[in-house]
């Protein structure tokens, strides 16, 4: 809330303002259920957007009401017409206010969806304080993966957005840290694009791509090749936790490594999980927004995700998904094994290119296997196996 002293004078703004007042000062649980954040976080969000990102109130609509309208759109998947009816505003007013909030959130996203200063030089407590991973993965700085979001594709290029299931989607490449915050996102790639090609494009062409510093690396799944700065699992070896739950504990060093790698890398799956669960607009199978607007909305929800994580450590959704270590988004292991075989074929066909050293001490990405990282994987596997009782 921006100016508490004006609260008593804000009771003449009609049904919309009365609704917001109830959310801000009534039940905190009701505020959380409707706006997807608690009252304190909502007030902090309004203040930040006003003071740092240029969101302004007007004579008829205060900032809190505009932000609440936007949060109901992305958090509850409400239409503009439903919002206009609930807040007793004209369609034009609602559209204008939603656009203003979206614009402010996109400015915030430019600051929020990147590593913090010193991020790669300090160790996240979640990693250091867990002896399952420390010190074995001491140089790991996060996890990387892609996920698919339904999309209304442009008519001129609709087929490019149809993936294996023939549903139109866009690919979202994201990197998260072990605090379940996004530190990079590239949104809007057609769903047919291969994960490795998306990463290659971003790493070579995007100026703000957070290349891992020398000696550091991200965890990736078998859809990406293991190379300097990107540590993947052993292929054609059990990997996902549910495979070990069904088939018994690891039986060799490679399985020991894969199980621990899968457990640690699940942070990206859980980050995707809480993000999609909180912002219900992302679940829409057939989005009603055009591609450009949809990309902006998806990006805004990722920025909101980070804001909530920083503002409210005990957010119920984050707490729930922190505990779901065995969650992963793929679900179809047979399909995943087929994907791995295709990836290996692509890796063999990929020609190694020299990219120079223009990354200021960071590692340029080349989608080819790397013996040094494979050696690191072997060493970590051997170290993990020393404390693991194998059946031989």
Task: Indicate residue ranges for each PLM-predicted region.
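Short alpha-helical segments in extracytoplasmic peptidoglycan/chitin-binding modules
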Residues: 38, 69, 83
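Short, well-ordered secondary-structure "scaffold" segments embedded in the functional core
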Residues: 79-392
């Amino acid at each position: 809330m921006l100016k508490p002293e004006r609260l008593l004078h804000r009771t003449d703004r009609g049904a919309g303002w009365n609704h917001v007042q109830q959310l801000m000062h009534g039940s905190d649980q009701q505020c959380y259920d409707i706006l997807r954040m608690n009252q304190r976080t909502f007030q902090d969000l309004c203040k930040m957007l006003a003071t740092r990102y240029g969101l302004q109130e007007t004579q008829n609509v205060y900032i809190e009401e505009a932000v609440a309208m936007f949060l109901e759109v992305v958090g509850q998947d409400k239409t503009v017409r439903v919002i206009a009816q609930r807040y007793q505003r004209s369609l034009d007013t609602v559209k204008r206010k939603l656009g203003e909030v979206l614009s402010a959130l996109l400015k915030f996203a430019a600051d929020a969806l990147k590593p913090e200063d010193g991020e790669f030089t300090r160790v996240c407590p979640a990693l250091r304080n867990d002896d399952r991973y420390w010190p074995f993965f001491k140089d790991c700085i996060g996890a990387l993966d892609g996920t698919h979001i339904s999309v209304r594709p442009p008519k001129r290029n609709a087929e490019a957005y149809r993936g294996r299931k023939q549903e139109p989607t866009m690919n979202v490449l994201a990197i998260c840290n072990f605090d379940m915050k996004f530190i990079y996102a590239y949104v809007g790639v057609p769903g047919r694009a291969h994960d490795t090609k998306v990463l290659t494009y971003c790493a070579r062409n995007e100026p703000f791509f957070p290349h891992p510093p020398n000696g550091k690396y991200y965890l990736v799944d078998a859809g990406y090749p293991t190379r300097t700065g990107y540590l993947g699992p052993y292929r054609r070896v059990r990997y996902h936790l549910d495979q070990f739950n069904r088939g018994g504990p690891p039986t060799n060093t490679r399985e020991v490594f894969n199980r621990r790698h899968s457990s640690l890398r699940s942070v990206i799956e859980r980050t995707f999980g809480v993000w999609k669960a909180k912002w219900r607009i992302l679940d829409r199978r057939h989005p009603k927004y055009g591609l450009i607007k949809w990309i902006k909305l998806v990006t805004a929800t990722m920025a909101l995700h980070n804001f909530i994580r920083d503002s409210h450590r005990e957010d119920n959704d984050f707490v729930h998904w922190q505990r779901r270590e065995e969650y992963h988004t793929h679900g179809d292991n047979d399909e995943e094994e087929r994907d791995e075989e295709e990836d290996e074929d692509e890796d063999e066909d990929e020609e190694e290119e020299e990219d120079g050293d223009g990354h200021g001490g960071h590692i340029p990405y080349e989608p080819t296997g790397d013996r040094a990282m494979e050696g690191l994987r072997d060493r970590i596997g051997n170290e993990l196996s020393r404390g693991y009782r194998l059946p031989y």
